[in-house]
Every structure is written in C-alpha cells, then in structure tokens.
C-alpha cells in the first residue's frame, strides 16, 4: 500500500508507532514540538518536518498522539488549514468523550474525516506488538487504512460511530485500574507477610490470579522501578 503516514506527537506512544511502522517499510513523516524526539526516528527513516502543517500536507492519513486537549486543539487548528478534502485523521489520544466529539465536528466542517481510535496498551505493549486499537467513525475510512492499524497493533476493532472508541477505551481503563490496584495491594500484603517481591511476581504471574497488568506492572512493583513503560506522566514527574 503506497501511502504516507503522518504522526503528530512522538512521545512514548506516537514515537513507538512511528518506529514500528518504519520497521515494516511504511513511509512515515512526523512532527513533535520537542524536536529532540524526532532525531532518533529520523535516523531510522522517518521524514522529519518543521511543523504540523508540513506533516498534514505530506500525509495520506494522520495519526495524532497527544497528551491533552490543549495540544490536540493546537494541532487541529493547523491541520484544517491544509486543503485536503476527505483526509483521514486517526485520533489515538485518551481524552474525554466530549473533547473527541468536538474535534470530530471541527474536522467535519473542513471536509476531513476523524476516526476516534484510542489505543489500549502501554508503550511497552506497543513495542511488543500486543496493544489493541478501538476504531470508531467512518467505517470505509477504517477499512481503507486497516493495513496501517494492523501494522502497529496485535488486534484492532471497529466499534461503530465516532465516540464509541473512547467509550470502549474508558471501560478498558477501568479494568486496568482495578487490576493494577489489586496487584499493588497483593504485593504490599505479600511483603508484609515476609515474602520476597520478586518471588511473589514469579509465582503468581502464570497462575489463575495473574493478569496482563500484573504481568506488566507487577514486574515494576517487584523491582520498585517504574521507569520502563512509565509514559508521559512519569517523564513529567521525573522533571
């Protein structure tokens, strides 16, 4: 499929999406307000750009991966300046439902197509090709660019009208928080009972009480080291 994928936001999620697609011979152009994020990706073949406008002008499909609504609104304000009708924007950020619907309307008014496509998974899950994507919106646009979504996820699902992707992601997040909290309480309880945290992780991980979150975050808890896969909020905390 001869297409150019534009990625706006090259943090822990967007940067890994770019790297994975590049490894699978996709043509990728990217932009991030933090220029240092672009250099290592440029070294492996990504076209480094100077602005959101430049990426939008180059891309057949845009993927936005941004930390908050303020950043997304700034990007959309530039994207709508590019005169490409029916250009598809796959919005992968985790934001409030009303924010996603607002952006959808702004893009629709400029004859652009937004797919609400939040990702279920951590940066390390993206790297390991175990993340999922919940796509919602224009089904024909989703089908057209399905090879792109399949390029960086293990599973992807079309879940209906715009906003359904975010609804599904919020349900997934609810389960993530439940399992993460339970894993943390289990670790603390085990250590108070005199058990070694590394042993707790090793023994419980493959059993009936294990979970994907225990697999990923239990390892961090056992080592008391949360840097790997910590994501944007951990990077902000470290600063």
Which residues are covered by each model-predicted region?
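Small-residue-rich helix-loop
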Residues: 195-208
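Rossmann-fold dinucleotide-binding core
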Residues: 5, 10, 95-173
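Rossmann-fold NAD(P) dinucleotide-binding segment
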Residues: 52-113
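Hydrophobic beta-strand scaffold residues
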Residues: 28, 48, 113-115, 156, ...
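NAD(P)+-binding Rossmann beta1-loop-alpha1 motif at the extreme N-terminus of oxidoreductases
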Residues: 1-64, 86-88, 123
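Interdomain hinge/lid region at the active-site interface
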Residues: 166, 175, 212-239
């Amino acid at each position: 499929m001869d297409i150019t994928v534009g990625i706006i936001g090259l943090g822990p999620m967007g940067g890994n999406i770019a790297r994975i697609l590049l490894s699978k011979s996709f043509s990728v152009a990217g932009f991030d307000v933090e220029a240092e994020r672009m250099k290592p990706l440029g070294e492996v073949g990504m076209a480094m750009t100077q602005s959101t406008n430049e990426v939008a002008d180059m891309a057949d499909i845009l993927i936005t991966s941004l930390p908050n609504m303020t950043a997304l609104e700034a990007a959309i304000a530039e994207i709508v300046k590019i005169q490409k009708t029916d250009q598809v924007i796959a919005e992968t950020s985790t934001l409030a439902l009303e924010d996603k619907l607002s952006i959808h309307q702004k893009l629709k008014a400029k004859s652009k197509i937004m797919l609400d496509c939040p990702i279920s998974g951590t940066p390390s899950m993206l790297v390991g090709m175990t993340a999922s994507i919940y796509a919602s919106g224009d089904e024909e646009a989703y089908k057209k660019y399905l090879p792109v979504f399949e390029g960086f996820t293990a599973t992807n699902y079309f879940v209906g009208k715009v906003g359904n992707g975010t609804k599904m992601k919020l349900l997934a997040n609810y389960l993530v928080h439940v399992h993460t909290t339970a894993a943390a309480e289990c670790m603390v309880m085990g250590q108070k009972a005199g058990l070694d945290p590394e042993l707790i992780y090793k023994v419980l991980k493959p059993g009936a009480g294990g979970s994907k979150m225990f697999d990923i975050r239990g390892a961090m808890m056992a080592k008391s080291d949360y840097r790997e896969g910590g994501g944007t909020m951990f990077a902000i905390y470290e600063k």
